[in-house]
Amino acid sequence: MERAIFAGGCFWCMVQPFEELDGIESVLSGYTGGHVENPTYKEVCSKTTGHTEAVEIIFNPEKISYANLVELYWAQTDPTDAFGQFEDRGDNYRPVIFYENEEQRQIAQKSKDKLQASGRFDRPIVTSIEPADTFYPAEDYHQAFYRTNPARYALSSARRHAFLEENWH
């Protein structure tokens, strides 16, 4: 098994697209990239921990490639917005591909370059590509939020879904 970590705004919205794929062992919502150990949601939302909301994906590379995961990642985000995603603003919601090793870094960078060259967006692709750091799972009530709180999930993800439909589908 291998690990991928992606940040794309609110972690609630980043779980379902990956969780439904063959070859995915698990998708956890959590926090990474900050300077506080074991942060809470409240602490991360206070924007004092340096953490970004992200998802940790454990996958079987014999069934799905990291490159495929990166391509799906792009289609869940606005890669031209470095200051958050959709209705969620601030560094704790910034888009980041966190890489585990040099191979993942190269795959992510090549994919980013290809997206920029495609002309799909008229603004620069600003999603950051950074080395993975300690990943702290979020509190239980955040896990699989789209299943446990479907009405609130639908409300919180409406702008995201409209953007994705217009720009990726």
UniProtKB/Swiss-Prot annotation:
Q: Which Pfam families match?
A: PMSR
BP terms from Gene Ontology: protein modification process
**Originating organism:** Streptococcus agalactiae serotype III (strain NEM316)
What is the protein's known function? Has an important function as a repair enzyme for proteins that have been inactivated by oxidation. Catalyzes the reversible oxidation-reduction of methionine sulfoxide in proteins to methionine.
EC numbers listed for it are: 1.8.4.11
Q: List the disulfide bonds.
A: none
Q: What class of enzyme is it?
A: oxidoreductase
Reaction(s) catalysed (UniProt annotation): L-methionyl-[protein] + [thioredoxin]-disulfide + H2O = L-methionyl-(S)-S-oxide-[protein] + [thioredoxin]-dithiol; [thioredoxin]-disulfide + L-methionine + H2O = L-methionine (S)-S-oxide + [thioredoxin]-dithiol
Q: What keywords does the record list, in alphabetical order?
A: Oxidoreductase
Encoded by which gene?
Answer: msrA
Instruction: Give the record's family classification.
Output: Belongs to the MsrA Met sulfoxide reductase family.
Q: Coiled coil where?
A: none
Q: What is this protein called?
A: Peptide methionine sulfoxide reductase MsrA
User: NCBIfam families annotated for this entry?
Assistant: msrA
User: Which residues does the Swiss-Prot or TrEMBL record annotate as the active site?
Assistant: 10
